[in-house]
């Protein structure tokens, strides 16, 4: 992350104020203030994660994934024979915190801040699937989009989607 000295000074002052406003996280803000003031390039890359960007297309894809899981669960709930498909298979897991942190952050934002998909169970890890999921979800979306009735899926269609 490239910053001018003036930008670094402003950000340093912001962290100093946050230290006073949020004593519970003061140590974290002091650390970030030191990194900014001294210009530690390696550690400044951490800020890229905090101030990163998700393109509109990516945000829409994540919402589409969440909508697919909503449709899967609703369709599963309407099945005559729910025993043929384990409910956990139609439950949204989230994304991997280690490799898909920005996606995970967006999911948490959508649920906790925007109030969408609040019926999704975050689990003990807060939608951290603990394994990369993006490619799996892409395959699932391709199958789901090919279904003629995306919100009234048959057991066969549900199985095709979750096994994609």
Swiss-Prot record:
Pfam families: YfbU (PF03887). InterPro entries: UPF0304_YfbU, YfbU_alpha-helical_sf, YfbU_helix-hairpin_sf. Signal peptide: none annotated. Belongs to the UPF0304 family. It comes from Escherichia coli O139:H28 (strain E24377A / ETEC). SUPFAM superfamilies: YfbU-like (SSF116960). It comes from the Bacteria. This is UPF0304 protein YfbU.
């Amino acid at each position: 992350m490239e910053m001018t000295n003036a930008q670094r000074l402003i950000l340093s002052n912001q962290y100093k104020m946050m230290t006073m406003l949020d004593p519970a996280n003061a140590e974290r803000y002091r650390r970030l203030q030191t990194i900014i003031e001294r210009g530690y390039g390696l550690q400044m890359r951490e800020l890229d994660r905090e101030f990163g960007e998700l393109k509109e297309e990516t945000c829409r894809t994540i919402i589409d994934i969440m909508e697919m899981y909503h449709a899967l669960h609703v369709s599963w709930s309407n099945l005559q024979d729910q025993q043929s498909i384990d409910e956990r298979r139609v439950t949204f897991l989230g994304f991997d915190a280690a490799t898909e942190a920005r996606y995970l952050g967006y999911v948490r934002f959508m649920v906790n801040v925007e109030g969408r998909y609040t019926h999704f169970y975050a689990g003990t890890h807060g939608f951290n699937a603990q394994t990369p999921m993006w490619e799996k979800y892409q395959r699932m979306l391709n199958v789901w989009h090919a279904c003629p009735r995306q919100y009234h899926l048959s057991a066969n269609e549900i199985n095709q989607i979750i096994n994609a």
